[in-house]
């Protein structure tokens, strides 16, 4: 039961960690259930919040509605109450197109028994990729022998992962027809600042990861590939590691430096209001920019010709501290429950740390120890996946009615720092 429950939580939280082999343990009906759970989980907590409101006569109060508007972006470029329909429509469109492309790229030598199996494989992996689910219907996933050299499929899957990690607000801002027409007529108009910051940060992190991955793995996992193939492999891992969990290499065979790089990237995650986990790219960017501003002696945090409100900077710090603190506590608990793994000659603490960050960041990468973990360890990972998927929005939402404001403040006094 614990393995089935673990899988259902992993699918709903679009993580991808699995205590059993999805391709052999579950029938096609079971795999269909996993696919639907990934689809529902990928719609994002905000969409479910509005769906709950539609089904609840009481609906949302002004405070809750304001919080959701604030989470998406203040001065949003679309009405938040139209968000649900837009998210459904866009996600289905992308998944159908992605599934069709994967289907067309399947070659006759691939071991599918029927056309139905090809269609199911295509749809499953399209949904898994776009929703950053990390599950696969074939043994070994994207690292299966018949998929290792299917580089065009790798590119399609990576593109789906990237779109999912960009997030719905970014996609709406960049590709809504009315906004595109408006920008063509008025060239001075540009995408929302949050969109520009998120996309730039995301692409920079991908570029840095690709370069460092190539350096670390050139004579290791990339040893039997040419430059183009190696670049595609590095790009796939650089995109997937931020939350998708699909891999085209054996994670356990990676160099320690690459594992550490992946830990950092999983911790950062994808964009806000996306299918990705982690602290989010905007949080990471604000923390870096704030640090730079402090070093330069600036009083304000400035980005792209705009001053960032102090509240947003404080929120980013809060996300970093709570996310990092929760992850460290859960990692410590795993060292207490998984002593049998630490006692293995080919395993170490970094395997547990990698597994925990993968769960907390809803990434789904594993060095192969998920199935070895005790029921207590799996319980810790289940908790981590739940918390990582819900994130700060749900916590704020739960306590929204209890938020109090005061009309006074205490005198300031400086303390020693550093």
Predicted region positions:
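Membrane-proximal intracellular helices of multi-pass ion channels
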Residues: 1-418
């Amino acid at each position: 039961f614990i393995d089935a429950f673990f899988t259902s939580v992993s699918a709903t939280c679009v993580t991808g960690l699995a205590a059993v082999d999805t391709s052999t343990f579950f029938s096609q009906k079971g795999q269909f259930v996993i696919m639907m759970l990934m689809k529902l989980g990928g719609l994002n907590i905000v969409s479910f919040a509005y769906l709950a409101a539609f089904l609840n006569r009481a609906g949302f109060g002004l405070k809750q509605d304001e919080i959701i508007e604030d989470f998406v972006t203040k001065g949003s470029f679309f009405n938040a109450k139209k968000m649900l329909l837009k998210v459904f429509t866009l996600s289905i469109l992308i998944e159908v197109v992605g599934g069709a492309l994967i289907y067309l790229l399947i070659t006759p030598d691939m071991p599918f028994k029927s056309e139905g199996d090809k269609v199911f494989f295509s749809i499953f992996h399209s949904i898994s990729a776009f929703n950053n689910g990390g599950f696969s219907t074939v043994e070994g996933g994207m690292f299966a022998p018949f998929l290792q050299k299917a580089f065009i499929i790798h590119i399609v899957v990576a593109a789906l992962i990237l779109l999912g990690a960009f997030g719905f607000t970014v996609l709406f801002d960049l590709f809504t027809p009315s906004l595109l027409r408006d920008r063509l007529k008025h060239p001075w108009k540009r995408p929302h600042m949050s969109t520009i910051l998120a996309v730039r940060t995301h692409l920079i992190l991908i570029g840095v990861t690709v370069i460092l991955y190539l350096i670390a793995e050139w004579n290791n996992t990339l040893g039997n590939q040419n430059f183009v193939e190696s670049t595609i492999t590095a790009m796939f891992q650089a995109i997937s590691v931020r939350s998708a969990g699909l891999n085209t290499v054996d994670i356990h065979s990676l160099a320690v430096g690459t594992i550490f790089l992946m830990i950092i990237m999983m911790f950062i995650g994808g964009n806000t209001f996306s299918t990705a986990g982690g602290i989010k790219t905007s949080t990471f960017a604000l923390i870096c920019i704030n640090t730079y501003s402090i070093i330069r002696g600036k009083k304000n945090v400035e980005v792209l010709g705009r001053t960032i409100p102090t509240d947003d900077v404080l929120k980013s710090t809060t996300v970093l501290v709570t996310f990092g603190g929760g992850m460290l506590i859960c990692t410590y608990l795993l060292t207490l429950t998984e002593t049998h793994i630490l006692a293995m000659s080919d395993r170490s603490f970094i395997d547990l740390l990698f597994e925990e960050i993968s769960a907390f960041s809803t990434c789904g990468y594993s060095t192969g120890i998920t199935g070895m973990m005790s029921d207590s360890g799996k319980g810790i990972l289940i908790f981590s996946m739940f918390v990582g998927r819900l994130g700060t929005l749900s916590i704020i939402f739960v306590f929204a009615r209890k938020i109090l404001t005061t009309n006074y403040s205490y005198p300031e006094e400086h303390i020693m720092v550093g």
